[in-house]
């Protein structure tokens, strides 16, 4: 009975908001709330953009989701010094072109359609002290299905980020996807609101190597709590190997990935790839490109 109180599958909508947008994050099992930085942090921990080392950060990520569905994330963050940091993000989930079929024309009517879900967000964060950041995003959600079916919604996300100051330890907390409901036909569905907590720190560190550990808890409003753990090994700040695991998720299990970071004309460029296992559903791969300047 106690466990059953958490089980509310199908009670929320706009599920694409739950999909990991970063190959680096996905490779670490999604345990990225206290690690995220730059434009990627607009999704995981908006407060972290206040600690950007560069003035601009731009990211382009692509996820090959199930059933030939594409999930993309593009974002830019700008550090405006003492005025805080600002960001814009766009998340898109879209299907391939599909045929319109009816009981009388099961092979198709000659019409085609796409189904798409979109999130456009604006973020802001500011340093409160040299170790504490606060931030958030305001988001516009748009869902488009066949013909005249369109729905709009709005959400906000708020987060806090704390640099412990010992062995690179960081703690973060976030409330995500808090906002208006969406109506499908005659049913009203809530947003997939979640509460997330993350803690990360250096396990090992030397002049040219480090091993970073991360653990997170994600409590969605439509399911039980999910535990996330991840590791990242860095070599010469150029090559990165990552692994992670989901605890309590209905399908997600292990994940792994790698990344490289290099300097081109005094501009840093990062490229990442990841693979995530979803049991009988298969493997999901992600790729990403990050520009820091």
Could you describe each region identified by the protein language model?
Residues 3-293:
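Subset of outer-membrane beta-barrel
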């Amino acid at each position: 009975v106690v466990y059953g109180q958490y089980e509310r599958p199908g009670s929320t909508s706009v599920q694409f908001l739950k999909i990991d947008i970063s190959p680096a994050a996905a490779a670490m099992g999604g345990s990225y709330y206290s690690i995220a930085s730059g434009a990627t942090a607009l999704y995981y921990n908006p407060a972290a953009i206040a600690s950007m080392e560069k003035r601009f950060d731009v990211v382009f990520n692509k996820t090959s989701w199930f059933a030939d569905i594409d999930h993309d994330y593009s974002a830019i963050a700008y550090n405006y010094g003492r005025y805080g940091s600002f960001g814009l993000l766009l998340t898109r989930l879209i299907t391939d072109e599909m045929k319109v079929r009816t009981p009388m024309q099961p092979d198709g009517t000659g019409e085609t359609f796409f189904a798409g879900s979109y999130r456009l967000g604006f973020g802001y964060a500011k340093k409160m002290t040299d170790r504490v950041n606060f931030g958030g995003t305001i988001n516009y959600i748009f869902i488009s299905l066949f013909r005249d079916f369109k729905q709009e919604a709005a959400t906000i996300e708020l987060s806090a980020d704390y640099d412990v100051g010992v062995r690179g330890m960081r703690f973060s907390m976030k409330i995500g996807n808090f906002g208006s409901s969406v109506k499908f036909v005659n049913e009203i569905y809530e947003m997939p609101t979640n509460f997330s907590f993350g803690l990360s720190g250096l396990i090992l560190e030397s002049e040219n190597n480090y091993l970073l550990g991360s653990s997170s808890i994600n409590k969605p409003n439509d399911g039980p709590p999910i535990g996330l753990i991840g590791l990242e090994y860095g070599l010469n700040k150029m090559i990165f190997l990552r692994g992670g695991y989901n605890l309590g998720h209905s399908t997600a299990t292990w994940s792994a990935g790698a990344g490289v970071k290099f300097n081109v004309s005094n501009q840093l460029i990062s490229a990442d790839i990841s693979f995530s296992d979803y049991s009988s559903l298969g493997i999901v791969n992600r790729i990403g490109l990050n520009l820091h300047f």
